[in-house]
Amino acid sequence: MNDVIRDFFKMESAGGILLVIAAAIAMTIANSPLGETYQSVLHTYVFGMSVSHWINDGLMAVFFLLIGLEVKRELLEGALKSKETAIFPAIAAVGGMLAPALIYVAFNANDPEAISGWAIPAATDIAFALGIIALLGKRVPVSLKVFLLALAIIDDLGVVVIIALFYTGDLSTMALLVGFIMTGVLFMLNAKEVTKLTPYMIVGAILWFAVLKSGVHATLAGVVIGFAIPLKGKQGEHSPLKHMEHALHPYVAFGILPLFAFANAGISLEGVSMSGLTSMLPLGIALGLLVGKPLGIFTFSWAAVKMGVAKLPEGVNFKHIFAVSVLCGIGFTMSIFISSLAFGNVSPEFDTYARLGILMGSTTAALLGYALLHFSLPKKAQA
């Protein structure tokens, strides 16, 4: 396993632990006498946007920039480079997004407001999933880790497309025009083989602001910037893409994602009823994550292998695939992010119950996925 992937697993596993701590602290504060202060700080305006807005639209754009970098690297020289290696996790990812969405729709088809949250259980939290699998150390085959990484990256890319197509507000033509021009400039820099990162960051900042004002979610600017960064440097230079990827990892894993979790997982349980907690919305999300994810990933994976379209990675069997598919039911940060887009400005009550459904489904998936991996993997570490 090359250094990039090894460093990635190491970073994300530690980051996953921080996510749990940040979420637990947020829940504790939100349900303590400091709850009002917590909400007040998040809704304090700084430079025209609330602190919460800066975190969700600003800092999360950096997270999506990292996703863009990772996807591009995997497409050009990693697990997604060839059809043979990409087809299996790609098919699994499609099933893993389709089945949870269908389960959610089945539960909420009769509620015109709740139905907009259909994409919430379709997401996988890559930091949490990799954090859990890292707890099992060298017992986990490298090929299984690469499968999970590729699946999660394709899943993230699917979420990006969903946000762009289904969670976009009223559009500003002028802002969109500026955004398209800046996108063109970014790829022109790439075509001209500009390897210095500063020009990309300056143009990228303008792109982010334009997208923010356009009605399209600002985080998508991060993905565009990531795809524009060149993989290869000039002769004798390091890869600009890999350099930026390594530079961003600690800030994203140890800063941005835990901060996002802290800002979004603080759910006040005041006024939450058992009838509300067991209503169609949170149940649709929890079961979408806990049942839909493994059902979709495992079924599509099994069918792809049986039909001869793809083959299992070396050293991996269907017990491992099922365990990983359960682990992919950890939606957490990505699901909360989509919930904020679906319900944040429409129904705070729906958003609260959606987040509780996410926490229920994700926590159960994490525990069950770990247990299944623990019992299905070899007792001794892989050589």
UniProtKB/Swiss-Prot annotation:
It is a multi-pass membrane protein. InterPro entries: Na/H_antiporter_dom_sf, NhaA. Keywords: Antiport, Cell inner membrane, Cell membrane, Ion transport, Membrane, Sodium, Sodium transport, Transmembrane, Transmembrane helix, Transport. It holds the Pfam family Na_H_antiport_1. It catalyses: Na(+)(in) + 2 H(+)(out) = Na(+)(out) + 2 H(+)(in). The chain crosses the membrane at residues 14-34, 47-67, 87-107, 117-137, 146-166, 171-191, 205-225, 252-272, 280-300, 321-341, 356-376. It comes from the Bacteria. GO terms for molecular function: sodium:proton antiporter activity. Coiled coil: none annotated. One of its GO terms (biological process) is regulation of pH. It is found in: Cell inner membrane. One of its GO terms (cellular component) is plasma membrane. Na(+)/H(+) antiporter that extrudes sodium in exchange for external protons. Belongs to the NhaA Na(+)/H(+) (TC 2.A.33) antiporter family. This is Na(+)/H(+) antiporter NhaA.
